[in-house]
């Protein structure tokens, strides 16, 4: 019977998932960060990515609802606050809607989630279901894509500033804030997984959970590319390039 890898080897195995599969390598992101997206494509990305953003606190609430460890609950609930903010201000969702406004979309239209691609919905709901139903260790492991997020946020900020007129401080506030928030979340989540994946079976399951999450992120961009880049076939119910545009 094979033994579990030591912490260093196991962490390296987790990080290798991101090196091979994280969505910073997707052609759509390379196009976006390189200034090669039209405003229709940028807006379609903002609309569809909002659906993912809006479901993250719901995913985390589902996680907390079955978490019996108060220490874990105390650490995890900050994630909901990071995305939802306070009663009147703050939070990643509000900051994403500022981006929507900056690219010329009605924030109320974006928040309605009308026009979100079916492929986006299926991928995001699969993630929420995964976190709601899978063992706690796997649910935490699926969040470890945040290990790879700071680099993509930094590249995105630089690329948007260089190539797009809308990229002001207000528009980029979401990404700048995540540069501060994500490392804190990663530190806790990674330590939790390294501490609790104490058998090879649990390590394999953790790697599979992280791989699943990279598939969730990648498949959203596949749906977006198919609809708005090539072949450019917008499916029924997908944003038509006009609705909700205010400038």
UniProtKB/Swiss-Prot annotation:
This protein's pathway reads: Cofactor biosynthesis; pyrroloquinoline quinone biosynthesis
For this protein, the record's SUPFAM superfamilies field holds: Heme oxygenase-like
Q: Name one GO molecular function term.
A: pyrroloquinoline-quinone synthase activity
Reaction(s) catalysed by this chain, per the record, are: 6-(2-amino-2-carboxyethyl)-7,8-dioxo-1,2,3,4,7,8-hexahydroquinoline-2,4-dicarboxylate + 3 O2 = pyrroloquinoline quinone + 2 H2O2 + 2 H2O + H(+)
Q: Does the keyword Membrane apply?
A: no
GO terms for biological process, alphabetical: pyrroloquinoline quinone biosynthetic process; sulfur compound metabolic process
Oxidoreductase as a keyword of this entry, yes or no, is: yes
Give the keywords, sorted: Oxidoreductase, PQQ biosynthesis
EC numbers = 1.3.3.11
PANTHER family membership? 4-AMINOBENZOATE SYNTHASE, PQQC-LIKE PROTEIN
Looking up HAMAP family in the UniProt record yields: PQQ_syn_PqqC
What this protein is reported to do is described as:
Ring cyclization and eight-electron oxidation of 3a-(2-amino-2-carboxyethyl)-4,5-dioxo-4,5,6,7,8,9-hexahydroquinoline-7,9-dicarboxylic-acid to PQQ.
Q: What is this protein called?
A: Pyrroloquinoline-quinone synthase
